[in-house]
């Protein structure tokens, strides 16, 4: 899914003269900060579409040739800096015509509204006039009004690029079935004490490890049919958490993607081939997690438990919880644990996953960590 940044031209990409017509080369001036901001947005995965009202373009008072020269030069300068527009959409009507193709109308948007590859949740409109904001509202996307002397506005290009490209990675997932009601809220870019309430105190304690050692804000609330058993509550919590991770990560641009142990980790156990992920000790126990946000869910568990349950959590549901997270998040996870104390082994698994997550979700730039072009 590709986000689109729809942009006005005059007053947004290039400054608008007093007569509101850029019909000569000497009138061509770029808005401050537009090129570095658009480069940042390009690197964040955005495509660009110009949507502009040009009153009476092609008429005697505004000949097409007078428009084409400065416009083509503008496009060439943008292209020379690595900024290419997917399309340039121009409405030539007069305001009195009330044409559906004239902003804030969305008549020119029909092909885009039919395009299922567009990520509308991240798409936005940038312009200098209130009609640009109304246009955004008609498309049900976010609108940014640039700050200008003529029309007001609250934004500059640097702020817009930061808001869209560096937006906090948050998600709120509500999963309701006849068996459970689960709510998961997380913010991958904010550190906060985790809050969990599932009706299963030991399970709550384990979920807290994910937020605490993963380094992100996590709030999980669950109501389930515990009068039957713990299965539905634990399983559905895993599914909701996995979905929240998937939504918060978005297209995964800029993340580390992988969580694993460095080759020279002091915690590696000689001769034990299971220790190949992020390896964590807990007294006599050692747990290892290696993961990949590949979009292809796969789970491998290597370990066993002697007790039927630890606290109120059946040990058979420990790997089942992690499998549920993988299925809903598109995560490939290898989890290995060795030890004697089952409490330590279960907790070690949760902590190892959390530390591997911390590494994988860390932002390391703006590139997509895949040669396929999508994750």
UniProtKB/Swiss-Prot annotation:
Domain of life: Bacteria
SUPFAM superfamilies per record: HAD-like (SSF56784), Ribosomal protein S5 domain 2-like (SSF54211)
InterPro entries linked to this entry: HAD-like_sf (IPR036412), HAD-SF_hydro_IIIA (IPR006549), HAD_sf (IPR023214), His_synth_bifunc_HisB (IPR020566), HisB_N (IPR005954), Histidinol-phos (IPR006543), IGPD_sf (IPR038494), ImidazoleglycerolP_deHydtase (IPR000807)
Region annotation Imidazoleglycerol-phosphate dehydratase: where it falls in the sequence: 169-375
Catalytic activity entry: D-erythro-1-(imidazol-4-yl)glycerol 3-phosphate = 3-(imidazol-4-yl)-2-oxopropyl phosphate + H2O; L-histidinol phosphate + H2O = L-histidinol + phosphate
Binding site for Mg(2+): 8, 10, 128
GO terms (BP aspect): L-histidine biosynthetic process
GO CC, alphabetical: cytoplasm
Enzyme Commission code: 3.1.3.15, 4.2.1.19
Keyword terms of this UniProt record: Amino-acid biosynthesis, Cytoplasm, Histidine biosynthesis, Hydrolase, Lyase, Magnesium, Metal-binding, Multifunctional enzyme
GO MF assignments: histidinol-phosphatase activity; imidazoleglycerol-phosphate dehydratase activity; metal ion binding
PROSITE patterns: IGP_DEHYDRATASE_1, IGP_DEHYDRATASE_2
Family under the similarity heading: In the N-terminal section; belongs to the histidinol-phosphatase family. In the C-terminal section; belongs to the imidazoleglycerol-phosphate dehydratase family.
HAMAP family linked: Bifunc_HisB, HisB
Protein name in the entry: Histidine biosynthesis bifunctional protein HisB
Organism: Xanthomonas campestris pv. campestris (strain B100)
The encoding gene: hisB
């Amino acid at each position: 899914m590709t986000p689109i940044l729809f942009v006005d031209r005059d007053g947004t990409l290039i400054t608008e003269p007093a007569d509101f017509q850029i019909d000569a080369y000497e009138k061509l001036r770029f808005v401050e900060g537009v090129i570095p901001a658009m480069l940042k947005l390009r690197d964040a995965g955005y495509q660009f579409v110009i949507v502009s009202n040009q009153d009476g373009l092609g008429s005697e008072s505004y000949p097409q040739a007078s428009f084409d020269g400065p416009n083509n030069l503008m496009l060439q300068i943008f292209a020379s800096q690595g900024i290419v527009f997917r399309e340039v959409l121009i409405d030539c009507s007069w305001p009195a015509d009330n044409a559906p193709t004239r902003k804030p109308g969305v008549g020119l948007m029909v092909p885009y509204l039919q395009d299922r590859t567009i990520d509308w949740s991240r798409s936005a409109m940038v312009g200098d006039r209130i009609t640009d904001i109304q246009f955004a509202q008609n498309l049900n996307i976010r609108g940014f009004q640039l700050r200008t002397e003529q029309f007001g506005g609250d934004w500059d290009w640097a702020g817009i690029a930061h808001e869209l490209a560096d937006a906090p990675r948050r998600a709120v997932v509500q999963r309701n079935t006849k068996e459970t009601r689960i709510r998961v809220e997380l913010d991958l870019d904010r550190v906060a004490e985790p809050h969990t309430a599932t009706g299963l105190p030991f399970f709550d304690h384990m979920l807290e490890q994910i937020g605490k050692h993963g380094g992100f804000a996590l709030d999980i609330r669950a109501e389930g049919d515990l009068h039957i058993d713990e299965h539905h509550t634990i399983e559905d919590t895993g599914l909701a958490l996995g979905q929240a991770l998937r939504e918060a990560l978005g297209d995964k641009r800029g993340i580390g993607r992988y969580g694993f142990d460095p080759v020279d980790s002091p915690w590696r156990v000689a001769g034990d081939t299971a220790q190949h992920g992020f390896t964590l000790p807990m007294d006599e126990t050692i747990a290892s997690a290696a993961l990949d946000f590949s979009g292809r869910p796969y789970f491998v568990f290597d370990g066993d438990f002697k007790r039927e349950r630890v606290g109120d959590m059946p040990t058979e549901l420990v790997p089942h919880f992690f499998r549920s997270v993988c299925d809903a998040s598109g995560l490939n996870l290898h989890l290995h644990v060795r030890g004697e104390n089952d409490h330590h082994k279960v907790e070690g698994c949760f902590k190892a996953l959390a530390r591997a997550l911390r590494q994988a979700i860390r932002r390391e730039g703006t590139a997509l960590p895949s040669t396929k072009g999508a994750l």
